Amino acid sequence: MKTLLFTTSLFFFMMDAGNLYDFKINALDGRQVDFSKYKGKTLLIVNTASECGYTPQYADLQKVHELYKDKLTILGFPANNFGGQEPGTNTQIASFCQKNYGVTFQMFEKISVKGADQHELYQWLKDKTGEEPTWNFCKYLVKPDGTVKFFASGVNPIEIVDEI
């Protein structure tokens, strides 16, 4: 009986652990993005903010996107969890990113990346790594095989290129 319960629990855990591609999240322009389109791709998921000391990383994220877009898909998630450093609306954030950094990688609507109202995607990332964002511009590298690696804010996106 214990073996059956363990096997059943493991089965449901494994089913839940693989649900990244079930997410549907709105982009900054309001269009829904189905994460199933990212199956088989290496992803770099980043929580962003417009008024942070790390905000210049947008330029490096864009550079990495331009150089490695055939190998790596960057997904940006604005969040106002740390110091109120992302106060803008989705429209204001989109304008800021385009005007100041020429961002062309996929940006999503503003979400919460930690706390009681943490978005399910970030709960999934936390469950996979045991790590959650400690500040803006934390990064998760998600490989096609399902492995996920966490990088702190101070790690420049260019430093992650060797991992892809």
Go through the PLM ranges and name each one.
Residues Q123, D127-I164:
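Thiol-/selenol-based redox modules, centered on thioredoxin-like
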Residues D22-K24, T91-N136:
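Short, internal strand/loop/helix patches
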Residues A27, N47-E51:
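Amphipathic alpha-helical repeat scaffolds
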Residues K41-T42, E51, P56-N80, C97-Y101:
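Conserved helix-turn-beta segment immediately C-terminal to the redox Cys motif
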Residues K71-G88, T104-G115:
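Thiol-based oxidoreductase modules, predominantly thioredoxin-like and allied folds used
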Residues T3-F13:
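Sec-dependent N-terminal signal peptides
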Residues D22-T42, K63-Y68:
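A short beta-strand-turn-helix
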